[in-house]
Design a protein with these regions (language model features):
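Pyridoxal 5′-phosphate
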Residues: 1-164
Length: 164
């Protein structure tokens, strides 16, 4: 009985509780009103921007990142061309584990996701243990792409074989 409360229960006994009628038994505690209001505001914001504009912005940043990363030695971009993506750039850097790359990028003020992304079958198909994943959205701009590229270039130089 100690794990139940609010309107989800009809009655509490010493050794058990009885459920309330629908929909109350699925609505324990205080409703998450703040998040509902925040979600509505976010939806209004995106509606005002227009989702076509959001997608165009993402793809422009992806194209820019793809272009500027193209000549980084050992860098492989995984997935379709930028025009067929929506905000996500998956890549690997030869001889650099994505977790190490993420740490270096963090030191450059760039936050990425590194790992298998709950997609181990894909990682096996790609022949890699993990990938790095950069994401772009409405709050990113060309400066963020530049920071990503600088950080990746730094990592490539740091892990380059001696004399290379």
């Amino acid at each position: 009985p100690f794990q139940m409360g609010g309107d989800m229960i009809e009655y509490v006994f010493d050794d058990h509780s009885t459920w309330n009628v629908l929909p109350h038994k699925f609505e324990a505690g205080t409703p998450n009103v703040g998040d509902a209001v925040g979600l509505a505001a976010a939806c209004d914001y995106l509606d005002a921007l227009g989702m076509d504009a959001v997608l165009a912005h993402e793809r422009a940043l992806l194209a820019l990142a793809t272009e500027r990363l193209a000549d980084v030695p050992g860098l492989t971009i995984h997935g379709p061309p930028a025009a067929e993506r929506s905000g996500v750039l998956g890549f690997t850097l030869a001889d650099v584990h994505p977790h190490d790359l993420a740490t270096i990028l963090d030191e450059h003020g760039v936050c990425i996701r590194a790992g298998h992304h709950c997609a181990q079958p894909l990682m096996r198909r790609l022949g890699v243990p993990a990938t790095a994943r950069a994401s772009f959205y409405v709050y990113n701009d060309e400066r963020d792409v530049d920071a990503l590229v600088r950080g990746v270039r730094h990592a490539a130089a740091l892990f380059a074989p001696a004399g290379a």
